[in-house]
């Protein structure tokens, strides 16, 4: 099979090596590249949502990915997930959103969902995605948002342990509240999972479900390429 090529659009310089290692294990010979603009999040936060300038920049990045020969483009940030719906129409390459499989999993588990994030701009798009998936299945979703800005501030100040502590305390409180699922709305929260094995409520993070679906798509593309 021909090796597939994926381009991942990022809004932060997250641990790329974990993503590359996961995809290379699942997809033989895959070429993984990244386009990262770390100013996107601050621009979205400053304006309360994606501006036309943010949309235009991400559309240019998607077109650059297409020109580079990518077989698949991945939107890896929930905050700009709705922007992906726009730029997907401007390229002739399939676009996948990292959090869509997680949203589908949340809907499959029930209708009462807790959403936790450290950025307010992440919660709205994540909730709307879950509600959209639920509506497609005839379900009215009840999403409750939990914003932990102090965790974000701790991370930006160089205190990841404090970031993790704040989030884990909050998640353990949510575990007592009878939700059908707790959605960790930022892919970076995957790092918390090993320390949250005591949580009984299904705890969802987009890394494994999202990149698992992306790996399946890349293998499908490779088979088609021959």
Describe each model-derived feature in a short phrase:
Residues 1-226:
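Non-catalytic structural scaffold of enzyme domains
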């Amino acid at each position: 099979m021909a090796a597939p090529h994926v381009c991942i659009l990022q809004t932060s310089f997250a641990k790329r090596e974990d993503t590359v290692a996961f995809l290379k294990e699942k997809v033989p010979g895959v070429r993984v590249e990244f386009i990262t603009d770390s100013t996107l999040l601050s621009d979205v936060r400053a304006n309360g949502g994606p501006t036309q300038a943010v949309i235009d920049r991400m559309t240019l990045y998607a077109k650059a990915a297409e020109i580079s020969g990518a077989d698949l483009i991945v939107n890896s940030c929930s905050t700009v997930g709705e922007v992906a719906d726009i730029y997907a129409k401007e390229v002739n390459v399939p676009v996948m959103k990292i959090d869509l499989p997680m949203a589908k999993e949340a809907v499959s588990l029930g209708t009462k969902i807790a959403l936790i994030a450290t950025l307010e701009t992440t919660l709205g798009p994540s909730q709307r995605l879950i509600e959209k998936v639920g509506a497609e299945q005839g379900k009215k979703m009840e999403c409750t948002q939990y914003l932990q800005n102090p965790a974000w501030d701790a991370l930006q100040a160089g205190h990841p342990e404090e970031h993790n502590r704040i989030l884990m305390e909050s998640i353990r409180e949510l575990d007592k509240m009878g939700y059908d699922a707790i959605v960790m709305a930022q892919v970076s929260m995957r790092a918390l999972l090993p320390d949250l094995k005591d949580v009984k409520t299904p705890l969802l993070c987009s890394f494994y479900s999202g990149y698992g679906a992306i790996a399946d798509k890349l293998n499908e593309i490779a088979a088609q390429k021959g």
